[in-house]
A protein has these predicted regions:
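N-terminal ligand-binding lobe of clamshell/alpha-beta domains
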Residues: 1-264
């Protein structure tokens, strides 16, 4: 007897579908989760920004970007489940997809919401045991995470204009879990920042993220000139902003960051 899988997503939208066999993922961090859940044979489409696992760029259909879907490609794949995210995708595109396909959307700011997403997707895809194991390991590794001293930190994720990660973001949640103080805690989302504002914030540590703006060593001095006393570090943006199974690797990465800051 055929049965349905039922799930309510983070928008409180309920979907009831046959166990999915043709999945399209619209978000890089959730694409990696699908791989870690062992769904290689059931994922048929990903975005051009879905870089993990690397081999999927060669074996899966690329359906465009996270904010510009190629609807003809998606339609040709005949998906029975599309998985997206409120922040990373665009409402107009999601509404259009929902006219034809089941769409499950995440909306993640808090740590527990990330774990809930992993649990929900594992239930939808009948990989509950693997999902539970991933969640259990993430929780254990974060519980063992040594906290940073309460240093004032600024996380920059864009240049020209400068933009930082403030309250109401998953990045802010991760910064706080490390023990650091986000100097943009009183702001919301991703505020634009002038050089004078950055000086006024007076962070002790500045993280230059690898994404979405690809900060590299040539930008270190530019920020150092604004904040001569601060420690400026290039960081892997995936470790701060990816809310899927990449969280398995974040605690070990933060230990390395402690060493880079000279914190034993």
């Amino acid at each position: 007897m055929k049965y349905k899988v039922v799930s309510t997503d983070h928008r409180n939208t309920r979907i009831e579908i046959d166990p999915p066999q043709r999945i399209v993922s619209l978000v890089p961090s959730q694409t990696e989760l699908l791989f870690d859940l062992g769904l290689d044979d059931r994922v048929v489409g990903i975005t051009k920004f879905c870089v993990r696992p690397e081999k999927w760029k060669k074996t899966k259909a690329v359906i465009g970007g996270t904010k510009n879907f190629h609807f003809d490609v998606i339609e040709s794949l005949h998906p029975d489940l599309i998985i997206g995210n409120k922040e990373e995708n665009y409402e107009e595109g999601i509404v259009r997809l929902e006219e034809f396909f089941p769409v499950w959307m995440s909306d993640i700011v808090e740590f527990q919401q990330a774990l809930d997403m992993i649990r929900s997707i594992s239930l939808l895809t009948q990989t509950e045991r693997k999902g539970a194991a991933i969640i259990d390991t993430i929780e254990k590794r974060f519980k063992r995470l040594y906290q940073f001293p309460p240093l004032r930190a600024l996380y920059l994720m864009w240049r020209n204009p400068w933009m930082g990660a403030a309250n109401g973001t998953f990045i802010n949640t991760i910064i706080k879990r490390t023990g650091l103080i986000n100097v943009l805690e009183d702001e919301m989302r991703y505020p634009e920042l002038s050089a004078s504002k950055i000086k006024e914030l007076d962070p002790r540590v500045v993280f230059l993220s690898s994404e979405p703006f690809p900060f590299n060593p040539k930008y270190l001095q530019e920020v150092q000139d604004i904040l001569p006393r601060a420690k400026i570090l290039l960081v892997d943006g995936e470790m701060f902003s990816w809310y899927g199974s990449r969280l398995l690797h974040a605690p070990a990465y933060f230990r390395k960051l402690r060493e880079m800051l000279g914190i034993v």
